[in-house]
Amino acid sequence: MIHQSAIIHPSSIIEEGAIIHDNVHIGPFCFIGAQVEIGARTLLKSHIVINGITQIGEDNQIYQFASLGEVNQDLKYAKESTRIEIGHYNQIRESVTIHRGTIQGKKVTKIGNSNLFMINVHIAHDCIIGDHCVMANNVTLGGHVRVDNHTIIGGMTAIHQFCIIGTHVMIGGCSGVVQDIPPFIIAQGNHATPFGLNIEGLKRRGFSRSSVHAIRDAYKILYRSSKTVESAKEALKALAAEHPIINEFVDFLIRSQRGIIR
Protein backbone atom coordinates (compact mmCIF):
# COMPACT_ATOMS: atom_id res chain seq x y z
CA MET A 1 0.00 0.00 0.00
CA ILE A 2 1.42 3.34 -1.05
CA HIS A 3 -0.20 6.49 0.30
CA GLN A 4 -1.28 8.87 -2.43
CA SER A 5 0.79 11.70 -0.93
CA ALA A 6 4.05 9.73 -1.12
CA ILE A 7 6.59 10.91 -3.70
CA ILE A 8 8.54 8.07 -5.34
CA HIS A 9 11.12 8.50 -8.08
CA PRO A 10 10.23 6.35 -11.12
CA SER A 11 13.62 4.61 -11.04
CA SER A 12 12.95 3.14 -7.58
CA ILE A 13 11.47 -0.34 -7.09
CA ILE A 14 8.74 -0.83 -4.49
CA GLU A 15 7.74 -4.48 -4.18
CA GLU A 16 4.07 -5.32 -3.85
CA GLY A 17 3.11 -5.56 -0.19
CA ALA A 18 5.34 -2.75 1.05
CA ILE A 19 3.56 -0.10 3.13
CA ILE A 20 4.55 3.49 2.39
CA HIS A 21 2.82 6.06 4.60
CA ASP A 22 1.88 9.67 3.91
CA ASN A 23 4.38 12.21 2.66
CA VAL A 24 7.24 9.71 2.40
CA HIS A 25 9.80 10.82 -0.19
CA ILE A 26 11.78 8.08 -1.95
CA GLY A 27 14.56 9.31 -4.24
CA PRO A 28 16.09 7.59 -7.27
CA PHE A 29 17.37 4.01 -7.52
CA CYS A 30 16.03 2.70 -4.20
CA PHE A 31 14.77 -0.84 -3.55
CA ILE A 32 12.02 -1.42 -0.97
CA GLY A 33 11.12 -5.04 -0.18
CA ALA A 34 7.64 -6.48 0.16
CA GLN A 35 7.71 -6.70 3.97
CA VAL A 36 8.92 -3.16 4.60
CA GLU A 37 6.86 -0.42 6.27
CA ILE A 38 8.05 3.20 6.10
CA GLY A 39 6.48 5.78 8.40
CA ALA A 40 5.15 9.21 7.52
CA ARG A 41 7.45 11.99 6.31
CA THR A 42 10.50 9.75 6.14
CA LEU A 43 13.00 10.76 3.46
CA LEU A 44 15.09 8.30 1.44
CA LYS A 45 17.76 10.15 -0.55
CA SER A 46 18.84 7.67 -3.25
CA HIS A 47 20.42 4.24 -3.87
CA ILE A 48 19.02 2.78 -0.62
CA VAL A 49 18.12 -0.89 -0.07
CA ILE A 50 15.56 -1.79 2.60
CA ASN A 51 14.84 -5.48 2.81
CA GLY A 52 13.31 -8.18 5.00
CA ILE A 53 10.76 -7.52 7.75
CA THR A 54 11.65 -3.92 8.43
CA GLN A 55 9.53 -1.34 10.22
CA ILE A 56 10.68 2.28 10.02
CA GLY A 57 8.94 5.01 12.00
CA GLU A 58 8.19 8.62 11.16
CA ASP A 59 10.40 11.57 10.20
CA ASN A 60 13.58 9.60 9.58
CA GLN A 61 16.23 10.71 7.08
CA ILE A 62 18.11 7.94 5.29
CA TYR A 63 21.03 8.76 3.03
CA GLN A 64 22.46 7.14 -0.07
CA PHE A 65 23.83 3.59 -0.11
CA ALA A 66 22.38 2.67 3.30
CA SER A 67 21.33 -0.99 3.63
CA LEU A 68 18.66 -1.78 6.21
CA GLY A 69 17.12 -5.14 7.13
CA GLU A 70 19.48 -7.29 5.10
CA VAL A 71 20.38 -10.87 6.05
CA ASN A 72 22.69 -10.86 9.07
CA GLN A 73 26.25 -12.21 9.09
CA ASP A 74 25.68 -14.85 11.77
CA LEU A 75 26.71 -18.17 10.23
CA LYS A 76 23.93 -19.93 12.18
CA TYR A 77 21.25 -17.89 10.43
CA ALA A 78 18.96 -20.18 8.41
CA LYS A 79 16.44 -17.75 6.89
CA GLU A 80 14.31 -17.58 10.02
CA SER A 81 11.67 -14.85 10.24
CA THR A 82 13.51 -12.05 12.04
CA ARG A 83 13.30 -8.30 11.67
CA ILE A 84 14.51 -4.79 12.41
CA GLU A 85 12.56 -1.95 14.01
CA ILE A 86 13.57 1.71 13.70
CA GLY A 87 11.85 4.48 15.64
CA HIS A 88 11.35 8.14 14.77
CA TYR A 89 13.54 11.17 13.94
CA ASN A 90 16.71 9.22 13.20
CA GLN A 91 19.43 10.32 10.79
CA ILE A 92 20.99 7.36 9.02
CA ARG A 93 23.88 8.61 6.92
CA GLU A 94 25.67 7.25 3.88
CA SER A 95 26.55 3.53 3.70
CA VAL A 96 25.14 2.64 7.12
CA THR A 97 24.25 -1.06 7.49
CA ILE A 98 21.70 -2.40 9.99
CA HIS A 99 21.12 -6.17 9.91
CA ARG A 100 18.07 -8.16 10.96
CA GLY A 101 18.03 -10.16 14.21
CA THR A 102 18.45 -13.87 14.91
CA ILE A 103 16.42 -16.49 16.74
CA GLN A 104 19.35 -16.86 19.15
CA GLY A 105 18.67 -13.25 20.19
CA LYS A 106 15.24 -11.67 20.45
CA LYS A 107 14.58 -11.95 16.71
CA VAL A 108 14.93 -8.20 16.32
CA THR A 109 17.52 -5.49 15.84
CA LYS A 110 15.95 -2.42 17.42
CA ILE A 111 16.75 1.28 17.02
CA GLY A 112 15.10 3.95 19.18
CA ASN A 113 14.43 7.61 18.41
CA SER A 114 16.46 10.71 17.52
CA ASN A 115 19.76 8.93 16.87
CA LEU A 116 22.53 9.96 14.48
CA PHE A 117 24.48 7.21 12.73
CA MET A 118 27.27 8.78 10.69
CA ILE A 119 28.88 7.44 7.54
CA ASN A 120 29.61 3.70 7.34
CA VAL A 121 28.31 2.73 10.80
CA HIS A 122 27.56 -1.00 11.09
CA ILE A 123 24.92 -2.25 13.53
CA ALA A 124 24.91 -6.05 13.65
CA HIS A 125 22.11 -8.49 14.39
CA ASP A 126 20.16 -8.27 17.66
CA CYS A 127 21.63 -4.92 18.74
CA ILE A 128 19.36 -2.67 20.78
CA ILE A 129 20.02 1.06 20.55
CA GLY A 130 18.23 3.57 22.78
CA ASP A 131 17.39 7.22 22.09
CA HIS A 132 19.54 10.30 21.38
CA CYS A 133 22.71 8.33 20.62
CA VAL A 134 25.49 9.47 18.28
CA MET A 135 27.79 7.04 16.48
CA ALA A 136 30.54 8.71 14.47
CA ASN A 137 31.99 7.48 11.18
CA ASN A 138 32.93 3.79 10.90
CA VAL A 139 31.68 2.70 14.32
CA THR A 140 31.12 -1.08 14.33
CA LEU A 141 28.83 -2.93 16.73
CA GLY A 142 29.05 -6.70 17.04
CA GLY A 143 25.93 -8.80 17.50
CA HIS A 144 23.73 -8.43 20.58
CA VAL A 145 25.31 -5.14 21.69
CA ARG A 146 23.11 -2.87 23.79
CA VAL A 147 23.63 0.92 23.75
CA ASP A 148 21.60 2.91 26.27
CA ASN A 149 20.25 6.46 25.83
CA HIS A 150 22.40 9.57 25.27
CA THR A 151 25.57 7.67 24.42
CA ILE A 152 28.26 9.11 22.12
CA ILE A 153 30.69 6.74 20.37
CA GLY A 154 33.74 8.16 18.59
CA GLY A 155 34.73 7.24 15.05
CA MET A 156 36.47 3.96 14.16
CA THR A 157 35.42 2.38 17.46
CA ALA A 158 34.60 -1.34 17.54
CA ILE A 159 32.40 -2.90 20.22
CA HIS A 160 32.56 -6.62 20.96
CA GLN A 161 29.42 -8.71 20.73
CA PHE A 162 27.15 -8.83 23.80
CA CYS A 163 28.68 -5.69 25.37
CA ILE A 164 26.43 -3.18 27.14
CA ILE A 165 27.14 0.55 26.94
CA GLY A 166 25.46 2.53 29.72
CA THR A 167 23.49 5.74 29.49
CA HIS A 168 25.36 9.04 28.98
CA VAL A 169 28.63 7.23 28.20
CA MET A 170 31.18 8.85 25.90
CA ILE A 171 33.69 6.62 24.09
CA GLY A 172 36.72 8.18 22.40
CA GLY A 173 37.58 7.46 18.78
CA CYS A 174 39.52 4.39 17.62
CA SER A 175 38.65 2.48 20.78
CA GLY A 176 38.18 -1.26 21.16
CA VAL A 177 35.48 -2.16 23.67
CA VAL A 178 35.46 -5.75 24.96
CA GLN A 179 33.64 -5.31 28.29
CA ASP A 180 30.62 -3.40 29.54
CA ILE A 181 30.91 0.35 30.22
CA PRO A 182 28.87 1.62 33.20
CA PRO A 183 26.72 4.76 32.90
CA PHE A 184 28.10 8.32 32.82
CA ILE A 185 31.70 7.25 32.12
CA ILE A 186 34.25 8.45 29.57
CA ALA A 187 36.18 5.54 28.05
CA GLN A 188 39.06 5.44 25.59
CA GLY A 189 41.64 3.06 24.19
CA ASN A 190 42.17 -0.48 22.96
CA HIS A 191 41.14 -2.12 25.15
CA ALA A 192 38.94 0.71 26.41
CA THR A 193 39.53 1.85 30.00
CA PRO A 194 37.73 4.47 32.12
CA PHE A 195 38.93 8.08 32.08
CA GLY A 196 36.55 9.67 34.56
CA LEU A 197 33.00 10.91 34.18
CA ASN A 198 31.15 12.64 31.37
CA ILE A 199 30.56 15.68 33.59
CA GLU A 200 30.14 18.18 30.77
CA GLY A 201 27.53 15.98 29.12
CA LEU A 202 25.60 15.65 32.38
CA LYS A 203 25.58 19.42 32.87
CA ARG A 204 24.36 19.99 29.34
CA ARG A 205 21.51 17.57 29.91
CA GLY A 206 20.35 19.33 33.05
CA PHE A 207 21.59 17.08 35.83
CA SER A 208 21.43 18.84 39.19
CA ARG A 209 24.58 19.62 41.17
CA SER A 210 23.57 17.12 43.86
CA SER A 211 23.08 14.38 41.25
CA VAL A 212 26.49 15.08 39.71
CA HIS A 213 28.11 14.94 43.15
CA ALA A 214 26.38 11.63 43.85
CA ILE A 215 27.59 10.24 40.52
CA ARG A 216 31.14 11.33 41.43
CA ASP A 217 30.81 9.43 44.72
CA ALA A 218 29.56 6.37 42.86
CA TYR A 219 32.53 6.52 40.49
CA LYS A 220 34.92 6.64 43.45
CA ILE A 221 33.24 3.59 44.97
CA LEU A 222 33.49 1.66 41.71
CA TYR A 223 36.92 2.79 40.50
CA ARG A 224 38.85 4.49 43.28
CA SER A 225 38.33 2.03 46.11
CA SER A 226 39.67 -1.48 46.62
CA LYS A 227 36.17 -2.97 46.58
CA THR A 228 35.22 -5.89 44.38
CA VAL A 229 32.35 -5.31 41.99
CA GLU A 230 30.00 -7.20 44.31
CA SER A 231 30.95 -5.20 47.38
CA ALA A 232 30.82 -1.98 45.33
CA LYS A 233 27.31 -2.91 44.26
CA GLU A 234 26.19 -3.07 47.89
CA ALA A 235 27.77 0.31 48.64
CA LEU A 236 26.06 1.77 45.58
CA LYS A 237 22.70 0.44 46.74
CA ALA A 238 23.17 2.31 50.01
CA LEU A 239 24.06 5.51 48.13
CA ALA A 240 21.03 5.04 45.86
CA ALA A 241 18.72 5.14 48.88
CA GLU A 242 19.60 8.82 49.21
CA HIS A 243 20.25 9.59 45.53
CA PRO A 244 17.96 7.58 43.19
CA ILE A 245 20.10 8.47 40.15
CA ILE A 246 22.65 5.94 41.45
CA ASN A 247 20.19 3.17 40.65
CA GLU A 248 21.50 3.56 37.09
CA PHE A 249 24.80 2.07 38.32
CA VAL A 250 23.10 -0.63 40.40
CA ASP A 251 20.78 -1.75 37.62
CA PHE A 252 23.66 -1.74 35.14
CA LEU A 253 25.83 -3.97 37.31
CA ILE A 254 22.93 -6.40 37.63
CA ARG A 255 22.57 -6.53 33.83
CA SER A 256 26.28 -6.83 33.10
CA GLN A 257 27.42 -10.25 31.91
CA ARG A 258 30.86 -9.55 30.44
CA GLY A 259 32.28 -7.65 33.40
CA ILE A 260 32.95 -3.91 33.41
CA ILE A 261 35.95 -2.01 32.07
CA ARG A 262 38.60 -1.33 34.73
From Swiss-Prot:
Primary location group: cytoplasm
GO biological process, one term: lipid A biosynthetic process
CC annotations in GO: cytoplasm; membrane
Its EC number(s): 2.3.1.129
Keywords: Acyltransferase, Cytoplasm, Lipid A biosynthesis, Lipid biosynthesis, Lipid metabolism, Repeat, Transferase
Pathway, per record: Glycolipid biosynthesis; lipid IV(A) biosynthesis; lipid IV(A) from (3R)-3-hydroxytetradecanoyl-[acyl-carrier-protein] and UDP-N-acetyl-alpha-D-glucosamine: step 1/6
Transmembrane helix found in the keyword field: no
One Pfam entry name: Acetyltransf_11
Compartments where located: Cytoplasm
Gene3D superfamilies registered for this protein in UniProt: Hexapeptide repeat proteins, Udp N-acetylglucosamine O-acyltransferase, C-terminal domain
Stored HAMAP family: LpxA
Assembly: Homotrimer.
Physiological role: Involved in the biosynthesis of lipid A, a phosphorylated glycolipid that anchors the lipopolysaccharide to the outer membrane of the cell.
Name the record gives this protein: Acyl-[acyl-carrier-protein]--UDP-N-acetylglucosamine O-acyltransferase
Organism, scientific name: Blochmanniella pennsylvanica (strain BPEN)
Upper taxonomic lineage: Bacteria, Pseudomonadati, Pseudomonadota, Gammaproteobacteria, Enterobacterales
